[in-house]
Amino acid sequence: MDLSEAREVFMQECGELLDRMESLLIEESTNPRGERETIDSLFRVVHTIKGSAGIFGFDRIERFAHDLESLMDRVRGGEKELNQGLVELLLRSRDHLSNLMQLLNVREESAAAVMGANLDASQTSLLSEVRAMIDGGAVVPAAKPQAAAPS
């Protein structure tokens, strides 16, 4: 398998993992139970995405997934509860990971630069929420980031 084929497998598998994450979170949102199986599954999804992104050098994805993994580890350890606020944060984080994956397929430099700048702003905002949760705070949605102007 050459590098482009391996990258395609990565993209496909991450897409499936993100779909799984979304299904788990939507189920938890509509029928909150905080079951160990759900928590473990969410942790594994984020852990796998982090590791796979690291193998390919997709640092932006790996760093973001690392903080999500740390948060999910706190949930697994019983330090955090999988409540509605956390589910909503994880859904937004899942969408952000999906957008980061889409950026990998953008070929035009100017479009990639604008999209990347917008995603950087979004990532900064989400990471502040994730890190606040890790440090013991509640989920308080950060202000919407300003979109970068097209160049």
PLM ranges: what are they?
Residues 1-151:
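Non-catalytic helical tethers at domain boundaries
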